[in-house]
Amino acid sequence: MAASWNASRDAPPEASRLLIERAHEELIAGNLDDRRLQQVRPLVRESWERSWRSRVGPEGAPQLELVSEELDRYRLAHPLASAMDMIRALLLPGSAEDSGVVVAVGDRAGRLLWIEGDSQLRSLTDGMGFVAGANWAEDAVGTTAPGTALTLGQSVQIRGAEHYNRLVHPWSCTAAPVRDPETHQLLGVIDITGGDEVVSRQARLLVDATARAVESEMLVARLRERAD
């Protein structure tokens, strides 16, 4: 089923934004035993702690690791390149330019390779370094859906102030890892970024289903090649 991002906003209630922001301040200050941290979702709190121990800055822009021709060559050779049409069809049906979300596909190292979707939102997310070639791994920018999904090997939803990097607090995101259908090694990650609608239950189901569809299509393509 293709996405309809304006439909559902049924994300489960979390601790208030103010409480999360205060807890984040305490963690950045090194107060890992502060009681406010216990009010933060365990998945988020544990990711914050990993980020803090890795000395990730709470406001730094991500590093651009792939640019121009190097990025083009890497994308062309990446195993997820052949899946982009399917990802667009499932997550950006209709007019992507006014979809209300940004869809990103990255490699297993957390580097973003393709970023598509709502043109107005993309002009805003560009400002925080959410661009093709940038490293959004957890150990580079802290807690985010794509980076933490790769770290944990499972789909992840991060809402607003749950992000480790303050530059990302205006945004919410859901991401799911993609694995090689035979070796089960990580190949990359699929992410949707936008407002609260992208951290709904429906959004997680759609992103998970898209990742599984990509894996299935890869396996079918390989079996066809072997049969020829």
For each feature predicted by the language model, list its residue ranges.
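Short loop/turn segments at beta-alpha junctions that line or gate ligand-sensing/allosteric surfaces
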Residues: E138-T143, A149-L167
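Short acidic/polar capping segments at secondary-structure boundaries
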Residues: E162-Y164, V178, E197-V198
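Intrinsically disordered, low-complexity terminal regulatory regions
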Residues: M1-A134, T148, Q157, P170, ...
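A short beta-strand signature within small-molecule sensing/ligand-binding domains used
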Residues: V168-P177
